Every structure is written in C-alpha cells, then in structure tokens.
Amino acid sequence: MSWKIIFTKRAEKDLKSFSPEVKKLIAKAINKKLLPNPDSALIPLKGKLKGIYKFRVGTYRILCEKRSTTLVIVVVKIGHRKEIYG
C-alpha cells in the first residue's frame, strides 16, 4: 500500500506563491523522499506544534500531519524555514 498526499487549501496557496523551479524541487522531494518512506523523512515537532511533522526540502519546510491508520499525509503549510514556524 502506498501513502497518499493531501494538500490543505492553505498549503495549496503557499505552493502557488513559489517559482516554478521551487515547485519542481518540492514535488521531486515529495515523490522521491517522502512518499517511499515517510517514517524516515518526517521529523516530529515539539511545543505548540506537537503532532505536526516537518519535511525538509533545501531551505524550505513542509509541515504535515501523518494519519498512519489511513496512510495519508496532510500537507498543512509550506514555506521558507525562517517564516514557516511563526
């Protein structure tokens, strides 16, 4: 069984704001690193973001929720590492 990626409306809006090159970089990272093995690619966050995972793509971060019972990864937010956590 394979994992399914779902983007929230917020994540879709974030993604649209990036250049085509960054979009391609993010898509490639999701397909080659995140989907094959999310357990090793996702890093759990702490504090007020507990329950959310980060996935690093260069200087960008993808914040996700992992629903292991249904094999779904929900992309919540996408942004530069300096701005994503605020």
Predicted regions and their residues:
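Residue-level recognition of conserved beta-strand positions in structured domain cores
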Residues: V57, K66, V75-I78
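Basic, Lys/Arg-enriched alpha-helical interface segments
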Residues: M1-R56, R67-T70, E83-G86
